[in-house]
């Protein structure tokens, strides 16, 4: 990518009322010997965010392999800029010992008018919940 980050697997965006409300960036799941690569990517994001927004409101000093727990995520850095929150998480998968980062960029300045779900959106949401449930049930 243009900022020198190598491990991005996916970028998802969420909109409400045509406003971008959330960006989710997720890395590939990689093995323990490459945790440094994940941290390096996160630090590149932090450098870029800091240039744009100033220092994070929270940042961990260093990451130790012992801080990872199966199936859990922890905050590596967080920015609070007005209505915007940027959270950088590191985590370990529960089923296999693989590690990843996630970055959430959220904008809380939601439009005031309440969004009424269309039938299509309702069905879509039900389908997603059902899929998530099936994935959970089939993964054990």
Question: How should each PLM-predicted stretch be described?
Answer:
Residues 1-17, 126-140:
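N-terminal leader/targeting segments
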Residues 27-140:
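Non-cytosolic coordination micro-motifs
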